[in-house]
Swiss-Prot record:
The chain crosses the membrane at residues 168-188. Residues 19-167 are extracellular. Interacts with CNIH2. Residues 1-18 form the signal peptide. GO terms for molecular function: epidermal growth factor receptor binding; growth factor activity; heparin binding; transmembrane receptor protein tyrosine kinase activator activity. InterPro entries: EGF-like_dom (IPR000742). This is Proheparin-binding EGF-like growth factor.
Length: 212
C-alpha cells in the first residue's frame, strides 16, 4: 500500500512541476511563479519542491507518521502560490498627445480665418508667412491693399474728327471739280462767240463789197 501511495505522489509531483513550469513561462510579464507546491492530505499540509526528482521522494506529513487509509481518499490537493507584484501605475499619455496635437494645429492654422477674417473688403485673404502679413486677391473691378477701391469704367465718346475731316476733303474736291467745269464751259462759250463774231464781220464786209 505504501508503494502505491509513493508512486501516486511521485506522478502528481511530476505533473505539478510541469504545469508550474509552463504557467511560469506563459504568465504576464514573463516572471517565474513561486516554485512551491502544497499538498493537502487529510487535514495535514506537506511541502514539496517543484523540482524534486520523479522517483524516490517520500512526502511526509507535518505531524509525522506513515500514510494510511484508502488511496483515492488520500489524493493530494494541489495549490499554486505566486509572488505578489507591486501595483503598476499606468502612464498618462492622453494629455501629452492632446497638447502635441493642439500645438501642431496652432502652427498650421491660417491667420486669415480668425485674426484677418475681415481684412479684405472685396477680395480673398492670403497670408504670406515669409513676410508675416496678409495680402488680398481683389475681385474684378476693385483695387487697393484691402480691395476697397472701385474702378469705374470710363466710356470714351466716338471721335467725330475723322468724319469731319473726310467731309471737308470731299467738299473741297467737289468744289474744285465744279469750278473746273464751270471755267471750261465759260471758255468754250467765249471761244464760240468769238468765232461767230468773226464770221458776221466777214459777211458784212462781203455784202458791202457786192453792193458796190
Amino acid at each position: 500500500m505504501d508503494g502505491r501511495v509513493v508512486l501516486i505522489h511521485a506522478l502528481l509531483t511530476a505533473v505539478c512541476s510541469a504545469a508550474v513550469g509552463k504557467f511560469g513561462r506563459d504568465g504576464p510579464h514573463g516572471e517565474a511563479l513561486h516554485n512551491e507546491v502544497l499538498l493537502h492530505e487529510g487535514g495535514g499540509v506537506a511541502s514539496v519542491s517543484a523540482t524534486a526528482p520523479l522517483l524516490g521522494g517520500i512526502v511526509e506529513k507535518e505531524g509525522g507518521g506513515a500514510a494510511s487509509g484508502d488511496a483515492l481518499s488520500e489524493l493530494p490537493r494541489v495549490a499554486f502560490l505566486s509572488k505578489p507584484q507591486g501595483p503598476v501605475t499606468p502612464k498618462k499619455k492622453g494629455n501629452g498627445n492632446k497638447r502635441r496635437k493642439g500645438k501642431g494645429l496652432g502652427k498650421k492654422r491660417d491667420p486669415c480665418l480668425r485674426k484677418y477674417k475681415d481684412f479684405c473688403i472685396h477680395g480673398e485673404c492670403k497670408y504670406i508667412r515669409e513676410l508675416g502679413a496678409p495680402s488680398c486677391i481683389c475681385q474684378p473691378g476693385y483695387h487697393g491693399e484691402r480691395c476697397h477701391g472701385l474702378l469705374l469704367p470710363v466710356e470714351h465718346p466716338p471721335s467725330t474728327y475723322d468724319h469731319t475731316t473726310a467731309l471737308a476733303v470731299v467738299a473741297v474736291v467737289l468744289s474744285s471739280l465744279c469750278l473746273v467745269i464751270i471755267t471750261a464751259l465759260l471758255m468754250f462759250r467765249c471761244h464760240k462767240r468769238g468765232v461767230y463774231d468773226v464770221e458776221n464781220e466777214e459777211k458784212i464786209k462781203l455784202g458791202i463789197t457786192v453792193n458796190h
